[in-house]
Structure formats: C-alpha cells, structure tokens
C-alpha cells in the first residue's frame, strides 16, 4: 500500500510502499479517506517535534484522519462505518493509569505515543489499524471533512479546561480573542463567535488575504499584531475575557496576561522552540493575582472531545469548509500539501472516497 512518511535520511515527505497492516484482536482495519496536514506535521518533518518509532528507519506521517471501517474484526464496529481516530496510544502497548481512566491526553512524556508524531506510525496511508476504543464514529454526511474532527477536538478540550477555571464564580464573558489565523485559529474563531458578543483574531497578514477574508465573513475583527501587539489590545480595542493562543510565539504567553480583562482566562496551545527574552515577572505576577486572571496550557484531547468535535463539525457552515480547505492532493503529489504560502490554509491528502 502507499504511505506518506519521513525517513531518517530525508527531510521532506516521502511516498513509500509498505505492507497493508493486519488488525490485532480488538483492532479494526480502516481504509483511509483523507488526512489533514497541520503545523505539527511540519515540525515533525524538520525535527523540532516528535520522534521515530523505536528501531524504525521511517515514520508514517499524519494524525488528522478520517476513514471507513474495512474489517471490523469482531470489535463491534460495522463495515462501511466512517470513523476518526484519536491520536494517543499506550506506550509499547502497555496500559497505565491515564489510559485506564480514559485520560491519555493528560499523560506526561514517556507515558504515551502519538500516531504520526511521537514513537508511532500515523494515518497517512491507504490503510491503518486501531483499537476500536480509539475510533470515533462520524456521520457519512460530513465524511468529506472528517479529518477536521481531530483539530476541532483540540479546541473542545481547550475550551472545556479554560472554562472550568471560571466555574467557581459567576463569570459572564462577552469578548474573546484568538491569537493566530491558521486553520486551527479560524475554526476556533467560528466556534467562539457562536458564544461571544465580540470576537477578535490576531495575525500578521496584509489585506487582501484569504484568512482575513474568513475572519471578516465570520463577523470578527482582524487585528494585525505588527500594528497592535497583543498586550496593547485593551487600549486599542478592549480587554478580553477569553484568549486562545495558537501561534507558538512565546511572548504571546506573557502578553496574554496583560490583554485579559478582570477575571479573564487565557489558554496556550502553541509549542515554541527555546527562546530567551526579558519579562517583568513582578508585573506579571501582580496582574494574575490582583485581577483574578488565569493562564493554562493544554495539549491533545480524548474520546469525549472527539465526540463533541463531531457535533461541532456538523454545525460548521459550508462556506467555511470550502474556504478553509485550499489544497486537496493525492499521495503521488503530496509535496503540494506541505507547501507554505499565503494562499495555503488547510491542505489535505486524499487516499480514497466513500
């Protein structure tokens, strides 16, 4: 079968031939439909994130996938059922407390592998196998965009955890801001716009730009951070009740605290490389304590977040899905899915269709 992988000798994505996998007991065989490409895939390729499976000379890429059950293998799934796979798996097949309680997304380093990212092959192949417990049903009506379930699940978890910090009191947020106008940021912006009176999105793009067009269509305010840095949002626009960071730009973590309103919460999802810079720690501490602000980090997601994401996917407007997916390519031309450019928002590798 055809797979897209990265080898220890090559930097870019490679079209490889590998044997079709056979499912173990408790696993199903899935025929892949589409796999999305995101920033993490680029980080895996350049070696700044993730790692190869033990002893392997290559790793199959891809963690945003949708497929069709080819062989249920006695799992209780049905042949022809559309599913989206979660990402984290038990390390070396051995369970631990995080997997036993259904919270693999809360496991520390070394207590998990991640398909297509850390220590385990991904889904960018014509077929893959997975334990049935990690396959989430997706309605056929949205199968074409089922690869978005994984990124949507990341936001479902981030929002859940951020809002949980405000549950002890009567929090009445009106304004939300997304830092980053990539595909994840734009999906999140639409989600937040359904909840908040006013929404903003911070980016670094000149008009005309397709991502800014989406921001405008959603009805949000675009903020160019070259003109208005994040910590100047309160003066230029307003202090924010909720800030969702999806840039990986390290200063944004600290600028978020300044940009939050009284009782506000910020959630960090970007993964920056090491970067030393000066921070006024006293003022930062003061802002958090005296104004009841909160800053949290979150990564990955689990089955319940995938299930919530499936519901959200069914609510996304057709125009947003059409505008968001800018490249659909086959495995033979996978390089197109990894090209960076101002017109590229969300790229997809298509292996098959329903």
Curated annotation (Swiss-Prot):
GO process annotations (BP): non-phosphorylated glucose catabolic process
The EC designation for this entry is 1.1.1.47
- List the Pfam families: ADH_N, Glu_dehyd_C
- From the UniProt record, which GO molecular function terms apply? D-glucose binding; glucose 1-dehydrogenase (NAD+) activity; glucose 1-dehydrogenase (NADP+) activity; NAD+ binding; NADP+ binding; zinc ion binding
What UniProt keywords are attached to this protein's entry? Carbohydrate metabolism, Metal-binding, NAD, NADP, Nucleotide-binding, Oxidoreductase, Zinc
* Skewed-composition ranges (Basic and acidic residues): 7-22
Q: Where does Zn(2+) bind?
A: 38, 63-64, 150
Residues reported in the UniProt entry to bind NADP(+): 181-184, 204-205, 269-271, 298-300
Provide the cofactor list for this protein: Zn(2+)
- Annotated substrate binding sites: 40, 114, 150, 300
Q: Where is this region: Disordered?
A: 1-27, 91-110
- Catalysed transformations (reactions): D-glucose + NAD(+) = D-glucono-1,5-lactone + NADH + H(+); D-glucose + NADP(+) = D-glucono-1,5-lactone + NADPH + H(+)
**Signal peptide range:** none
State the top-level EC class: oxidoreductase
Instruction: Say which family it is in.
Output: Belongs to the zinc-containing alcohol dehydrogenase family. Glucose 1-dehydrogenase subfamily.
Role noted for this protein:
Catalyzes the NAD(P)(+)-dependent oxidation of D-glucose to D-gluconate via gluconolactone. Can utilize both NAD(+) and NADP(+) as electron acceptor. Is involved in the degradation of glucose through a modified Entner-Doudoroff pathway.
Name-wise, this protein is Glucose 1-dehydrogenase
Q: What's the source species for this entry? A: Haloarcula marismortui (strain ATCC 43049 / DSM 3752 / JCM 8966 / VKM B-1809) (Halobacterium marismortui)
- The gene behind this protein is gdh
């Amino acid at each position: 079968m055809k797979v897209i992988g990265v080898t220890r000798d090559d930097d870019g994505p490679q079209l490889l031939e590998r044997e079709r996998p056979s499912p173990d007991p408790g696993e199903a065989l899935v025929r892949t439909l589409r796999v999305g490409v995101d920033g993490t895939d680029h980080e895996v390729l350049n070696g700044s994130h993730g790692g190869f499976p033990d002893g392997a000379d290559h790793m199959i890429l891809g963690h945003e996938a949708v497929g069709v059950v080819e062989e249920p293998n006695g799992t209780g799934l049905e042949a022809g059922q559309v599913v989206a796979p979660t990402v984290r798996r038990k390390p070396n097949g051995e369970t631990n407390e995080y997997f036993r309680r259904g919270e693999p997304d809360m496991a520390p380093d070394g207590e998990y592998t991640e398909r297509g990212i850390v220590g385990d092959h991904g889904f960018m192949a014509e077929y893959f196998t997975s334990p049935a417990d990690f396959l989430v049903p997706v309605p056929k009506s949205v199968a074409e965009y089922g690869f978005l379930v994984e990124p949507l699940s990341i936001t479902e978890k981030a929002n859940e955890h951020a809002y949980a910090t405000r549950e002890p009191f009567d929090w009445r947020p009106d304004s939300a801001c997304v830092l980053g106008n990539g595909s994840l940021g734009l999906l999140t912006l639409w989600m937040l716009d359904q909840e908040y009176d006013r929404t903003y999105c911070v980016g670094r793009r000149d008009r005309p730009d397709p991502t800014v067009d989406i921001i405008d269509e959603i009805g949000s305010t675009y903020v160019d951070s070259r003109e208005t840095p994040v910590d100047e949002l309160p003066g230029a626009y307003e202090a924010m009740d909720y800030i969702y960071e999806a840039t990986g730009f390290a200063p944004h973590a600290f600028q978020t605290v300044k940009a939050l309103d009284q009782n506000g919460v910020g959630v960090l999802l970007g993964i920056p490389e090491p970067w030393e810079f000066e921070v006024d720690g006293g003022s930062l501490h003061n802002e958090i304590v005296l104004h009841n602000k909160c800053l949290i980090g979150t990564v990955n997601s689990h089955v319940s977040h995938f299930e919530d994401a499936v519901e959200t996917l069914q609510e996304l407007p057709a125009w947003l899905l059409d505008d968001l997916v800018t490249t659909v390519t086959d495995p033979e031309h996978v390089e197109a899915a990894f090209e960076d450019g101002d017109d590229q928002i969300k790229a997809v590798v298509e292996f098959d269709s329903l």
